[in-house]
């Protein structure tokens, strides 16, 4: 395949709504990025990250000296957890405001970078808080400059305008999407991802798979989102087993990261629908659930529900997983079964019962899918009408 002709050590610029430096060693581009900020009169930043990955990955070994060499003032918020809450965002924003930060650097996967995006908004809207942002009490039109240093190959948040946070007292996990949330620059360096363990590697990659499953089949899907989806699935099927078997395999990490970026661009254009709308209540109620594994638990049932309406599209997109499909509605159950078999084969084996849910929880999950701010927008993009009965059946078939 053509991938063998590409030098993964050659950093290239992936230009979409932002500029992403992509390739092994691209973390060194942070110095160039900081110089751009400095030329704009910005010399004070807040770094938003998790509790240890920014150090374990090796990113901090490059970022910290670059900040100090260029004379930047910086503050650090390193308490972002999986499925971050609005309270974490407010804590970080408070530090940023108090220290006079004029830009935000997010280091991590989707949780830290989404938190960084949200903090960037609140640095500009000092009279607002994260609950107001995620309950859509105001529509932000500006944010402080955002730099995203990505440490996982799954969310695509470094190339898109989305962010997610949980409002814990309501079990809401809404998403927001505004143009001001695009990072100014992003870094996608696969050498920072070799410390991802097997579970993390699987979870983040299944997130990317779901992004394109949805982006290719929404009511606003386009040839562009379908094209990105086809290549994403091909790369995931080829390189996920290699990364699971050998975490240090930089070629596998490179192409999974590229697949993740493509998936981010795909759903930035084609949007999302059922799997994300139905997973968000799961990880809102049980924050310990890895987002990608929650998606994997319900994906086969979603495929079964939507395939008759989008058979020709999914037959092509899923051909690396289920070869030989004819794109006929009658294939729905077969495709769902084969998708689940593939998920189990790569190590994504958990179903809703494994997360501690029972079928008595289904009415609550349906209610959250229907009432959480923003999820109605996702449901309205589904290729089938997302009635309560349809949603309940998907949950029912995911145990």
Curated annotation (Swiss-Prot):
SUPFAM superfamilies, per database record: Dehydroquinate synthase-like
Enzyme class: oxidoreductase
Keywords, comma-separated and alphabetical: NADP, Oxidoreductase, Zinc
Obligatory cofactor(s): Zn(2+)
Keyword check for NADP: yes
Any coiled-coil regions, as ranges: none
Temperature dependence: Thermostable. Heating at 70 degrees Celsius for 180 minutes gives no observable loss of enzymatic activity.
Cited function: Alcohol dehydrogenase active against primary long-chain alcohols. Pentan-1-ol is the optimum substrate in vitro, but also shows efficient dehydrogenase activity on propanol, hexanol, and ethanol.
The protein's name: Long-chain primary alcohol dehydrogenase AdhA
Species name: Thermoanaerobacter ethanolicus
């Amino acid at each position: 395949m053509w991938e063998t002709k590409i030098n993964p050590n050659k950093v290239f610029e992936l230009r979409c709504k932002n500029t992403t430096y992509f390739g092994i060693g691209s973390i060194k581009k942070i110095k160039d990025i900081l110089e751009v900020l400095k030329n704009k009169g910005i010399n004070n930043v807040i770094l938003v990250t998790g509790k240890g990955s920014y150090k374990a990955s090796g990113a901090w070994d490059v970022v910290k000296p670059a900040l100090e060499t260029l004379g930047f003032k910086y503050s650090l918020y390193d308490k972002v957890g999986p499925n971050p809450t609005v309270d974490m965002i407010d804590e970080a924003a408070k530090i940023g405001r108090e220290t006079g930060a004029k830009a935000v650097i997010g280091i991590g996967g989707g949780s830290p970078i989404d938190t960084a995006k949200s903090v960037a908004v609140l640095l500009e809207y000092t009279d607002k808080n994260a609950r107001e942002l995620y309950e859509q009490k105001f529509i932000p039109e500006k944010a402080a400059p955002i730099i995203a240093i990505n440490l996982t190959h799954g969310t695509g948040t470094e190339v898109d305008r989305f962010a997610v946070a949980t409002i814990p007292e309501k079990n809401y996990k809404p998403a927001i999407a505004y143009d001001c949330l695009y990072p100014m620059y992003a870094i996608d360096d696969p050498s920072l991802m070799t410390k991802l363990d097997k579970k993390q590697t699987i979870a983040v990659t299944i997130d990317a798979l779901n992004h394109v499953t949805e982006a290719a089949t929404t009511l606003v899907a386009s040839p562009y989102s379908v094209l990105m989806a086809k290549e994403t699935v091909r790369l995931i099927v080829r390189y996920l087993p290699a990364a699971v078997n050998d975490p240090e395999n930089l070629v596998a990490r490179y192409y999974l990261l590229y697949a993740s970026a493509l998936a981010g661009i795909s759903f930035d254009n084609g949007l999302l629908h059922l799997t994300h709308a139905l997973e968000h209540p799961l990880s809102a109620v049980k924050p310990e659930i890895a987002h990608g594994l929650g998606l994997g638990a319900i994906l086969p049932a979603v495929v079964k529900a939507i395939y008759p309406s989008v058979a020709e599209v999914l037959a092509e997109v899923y051909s690396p997983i289920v070869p030989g499909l004819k794109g006929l509605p009658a294939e729905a159950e077969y495709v769902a079964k084969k998708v689940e078999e593939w998920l189990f084969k790569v190590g994504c084996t958990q179903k809703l019962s494994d997360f501690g849910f029972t079928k008595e929880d289904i009415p609550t999950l349906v209610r959250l899918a229907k009432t959480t701010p923003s999820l109605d927008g996702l449901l309205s993009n589904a290729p089938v009408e997302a009635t309560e009965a349809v949603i309940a059946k998907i949950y029912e078939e995911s145990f």
